[in-house]
């Protein structure tokens, strides 16, 4: 048994493995708990919609000078899109919760911050899986927790759908997260209304 400890970081571990180090256990400790490269969590809850008395959601938006901090309005869900032939991840698509898609039809994906960057997925060449799963509805738990073994197997299967380029520790390729046309149009409309 070979153990390496004392403030190990992912780059050091990667380099040691690439160099053929015969280490069977890593003592990561502090660097497992607190990322040295990104010590703060950037996720913050923001108001996206207000539900009226009729149960309809009125989209709301938070505007910022920083384009990445402008929120996506409305009651949303997200779909993971896979290549039908290879099973590999193509992109994630954020859309309104009431939007539906037909995988037999062409799907145009575009970068919401650079809309000229487009990818057309021909109908029949992709599959979609909704990522958001209801946990509570009307105060009742609707979710059956999987076992640890089931969670581990699910994670293994999902990891297999990632391209090697996205799993690199240094300079990884991004997994695309796009907006549906309907969500993009609503966001643009709210931004334009706010500046008039």
Predicted ranges, named:
Residues 1-13:
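Single conserved hydrophobic/aromatic residue that forms the stacking wall/gate
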Residues 14-196:
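Gly/Ser/Thr/Ala-enriched C-terminal appendages of enzymes
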């Amino acid at each position: 048994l070979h153990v390496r400890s004392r403030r190990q970081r992912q780059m050091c571990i990667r380099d040691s493995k690439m160099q053929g180090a015969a280490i069977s256990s890593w003592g990561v400790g502090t660097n497992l708990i607190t990322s040295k490269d990104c010590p703060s969590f950037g996720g913050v809850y923001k108001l996206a919609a207000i539900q009226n008395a009729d149960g309809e959601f009125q989209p709301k938006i938070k505007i910022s000078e920083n384009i990445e901090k402008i929120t996506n309005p409305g009651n949303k869900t997200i779909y993971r899109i896979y290549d039908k032939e290879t099973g590999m991840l193509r992109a994630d698509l954020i859309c309104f919760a009431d939007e539906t898609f037909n995988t037999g039809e062409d799907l145009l994906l575009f970068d919401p911050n650079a809309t000229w960057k487009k990818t057309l997925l021909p109908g029949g060449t992709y599959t979609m899986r909704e990522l958001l799963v209801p946990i509570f509805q009307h105060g009742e738990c609707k979710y059956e927790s999987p076992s640890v073994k089931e969670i581990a197997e699910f994670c293994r299967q999902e990891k297999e759908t990632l391209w090697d380029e996205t799993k690199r520790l240094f300079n990884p390729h991004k997994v695309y997260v796009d907006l549906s046309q309907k969500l993009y149009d609503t966001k643009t409309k709210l931004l334009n209304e706010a500046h008039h």
